[in-house]
Amino acid sequence: MLYKGDTLYLDWLEDGIAELVFDAPGSVNKLDTATVASLGEAIGVLEQQSDLKGLLLRSNKAAFIVGADITEFLSLFLVPEEQLSQWLHFANSVFNRLEDLPVPTIAAVNGYALGGGCECVLATDYRLATPDLRIGLPETKLGIMPGFGGSVRMPRMLGADSALEIIAAGKDVGADQALKIGLVDGVVKAEKLIEGAMAILRQAINGDLDWKAKRQPKLEPLKLSKIEATMSFTIAKGMVAQTAGKHYPAPITAVKTIEAAARFGREEALNLENKSFVPLAHTNEARALVGIFLNDQYVKGKAKKLTKDVETPKQAAVLGAGIMGGGIAYQSAWKGVPVVMKDINDKSLTLGMTEAAKLLNKQLERGKIDGLKLAGVISTIHPTLDYAGFDRVDVVVEAVVENPKVKKAVLAETEQKVRQDTVLASNTSTIPISELANALERPENFCGMHFFNPVHRMPLVEIIRGEKSSDETIAKVVAWASKMGKTPIVVNDCPGFFVNRVLFPYFAGFSQLLRDGADFRKIDKVMEKQFGWPMGPAYLLDVVGIDTAHHAQAVMAAGFPQRMQKDYRDAIDALFDANRFGQKNGLGFWRYKEDSKGKPKKEEDAAVEDLLAEVSQPKRDFSEEEIIARMMIPMVNEVVRCLEEGIIATPAEADMALVYGLGFPPFHGGAFRWLDTLGSAKYLDMAQQYQHLGPLYEVPEGLRNKARHNEPYYPPVEPARPVGDLKTA
């Protein structure tokens, strides 16, 4: 054994060839600060071996290296800029020394090689991969850019265009694509990986392959003419500005850095990467996006823990076809759980099957599946007008109209047709689960399962625990949601549960702004362009359906009369009374017409002004700051109340529910992350300016207490140890 660290070791293989093996404790290899330091020590040992002829890098895990250790990021990013820059220089010196070894090097790459894992293998001369490879640089999705030389080596290896596509979008690619663009040199079956890598290494040692020529371009300026460079970078900057926008600085910074570094050799180019990385690491956007990644891991880990002792449902049923029922049936069947879809009329069943078929055909058009797979999936959805096959189902989700009487009747009837241990769930969006449970003989086998529309796109499923829902019931439904590829978050029962309960105060803030003379177009523009929501409140209401919102508003007002009961007629009432229900009937805040792709396109409609004039004061202008404050304070206050009341268990789950269920701007990280970034004391000062607007603007007591000491909701993070202790030499 030449060297043994905690996460990697170095040993001789044969006749002057050494192997460096990543083998961390636990299930995956990560390139954390300790591993980077250990890698440096191992390379130091290699540099002393006069008889070294070649080096093989490999992993003892199912994945090569999944990336840097993101759990270290928040503390690492709190380190002062100069120290962080110093540590990056040290880390890059390690990869440079790997690249500069006086012998050929090859990485045998299996499974994932992402972020730092990808940057590590870019420093070797050759890369041989297995068919399950996923390789790429996802850093821009975390609000940063590659920091271990990825923005320097990848463009020089692949050419600017292919590298920019991966780096700016934070993409990873599979084995075939990686081979096509030159990111790997070959793809072999897993059992042939080491043998194949050794064969390439021997050829390089024997002089049959010119490894020095392979290495050289990575050390030099980018080979691009002035015209080529102008074309590549101008197009890339235009594309990034369009897709990422101003709220995500990392992608455009990465492109500009690669452009600036194009005329330099490796050392100067790495210095530019360092100078760009460090300020990005200190942005609120990076903290928020890293926070989302960590929260996502936490939520998924919690679901895994919850379901470890239950069997995932093998057969499901959906009550109520239509668009929602068809979407749920498709998602279940697509992920391998056959489903019976029941309705009381053929027309709805046809609609449900058409929806499922439409979604499968889209997969076919995109080349994700072939005709055989399509036929196989659709054959596992069984439409029916009766209860045939219900004695075999493990879980049933009811997705009929949002009416408690209808839902109770359907659930009670279904309970008589299924096994004693079958779990029933209701896809209600507002009706309390404990109320629906009153109609059942086995309320312990019942819970809520709130999908979001469109089902195939929206990652969140709210799992609602009723007063009598058993732990096993919740676990089974969480297991089914996870199997469907969704992110399940368990919440306690109340009107609107979590997501809708916090959404309607936001809509109430919108209604009050309109009442006070604000222009709905300006509100939408500010909430989209400045705050970053995917849709402003007016457009969102049109998409949700004015009739749906009108009904839900009444349910919420009955549930929380002290805050959500209005004492005035608002814009939602006015549009509802005028039969303007939004996109579904082509008339809402806007008029809708289908574009060439059959998608609804909004147009101005003068008739809306007259309707809104009836429920509004004369038009007046509001500042962007006031619009954001008046829209967000009611939502944030309600989010905090939900945490204080135990409706949602943690700030992490609340923020993920908002991001995945409502499209809360990821660069803010969710309501609690936004609140922590702003500071609870500053938030309280802002909210108190608007408390005259009513109970929705009254800050909950728990938040007031935090504001006294400006306490955050997330546990405070300490900066990483001084970077000198992280090994900078």
Curated annotation (Swiss-Prot):
One of its GO terms (biological process) is fatty acid beta-oxidation. NAD(+) binds at residues 324, 343, 400-402, 407, 429, 453. Pathway: Lipid metabolism; fatty acid beta-oxidation. Keywords: Fatty acid metabolism, Isomerase, Lipid degradation, Lipid metabolism, Lyase, Multifunctional enzyme, NAD, Oxidoreductase. The keyword Isomerase applies. Residues 708-729 are annotated as: Disordered. Residues 1-189 are annotated as: Enoyl-CoA hydratase/isomerase. Residues 311-729 are annotated as: 3-hydroxyacyl-CoA dehydrogenase. It catalyses: a (3S)-3-hydroxyacyl-CoA + NAD(+) = a 3-oxoacyl-CoA + NADH + H(+); a (3S)-3-hydroxyacyl-CoA = a (2E)-enoyl-CoA + H2O; a 4-saturated-(3S)-3-hydroxyacyl-CoA = a (3E)-enoyl-CoA + H2O; (3S)-3-hydroxybutanoyl-CoA = (3R)-3-hydroxybutanoyl-CoA. Its EC number is 4.2.1.17, 5.1.2.3, 5.3.3.8, 1.1.1.35. The record marks 119, 139 as: Important for catalytic activity. Substrate binds at residues 296, 500, 660. It comes from the Bacteria. One of its GO terms (cellular component) is fatty acid beta-oxidation multienzyme complex. The active site is at 450 (for 3-hydroxyacyl-coa dehydrogenase activity). GO terms for molecular function: 3-hydroxybutyryl-CoA epimerase activity; delta(3)-delta(2)-enoyl-CoA isomerase activity; enoyl-CoA hydratase activity; long-chain-3-hydroxyacyl-CoA dehydrogenase activity; NAD+ binding. Heterotetramer of two alpha chains (FadB) and two beta chains (FadA). NCBIfam families: FadB (TIGR02437), PRK11730.1 (NF008727). Involved in the aerobic and anaerobic degradation of long-chain fatty acids via beta-oxidation cycle. Catalyzes the formation of 3-oxoacyl-CoA from enoyl-CoA via L-3-hydroxyacyl-CoA. It can also use D-3-hydroxyacyl-CoA and cis-3-enoyl-CoA as substrate. In the N-terminal section; belongs to the enoyl-CoA hydratase/isomerase family. This is Fatty acid oxidation complex subunit alpha. It comes from Escherichia coli O9:H4 (strain HS).
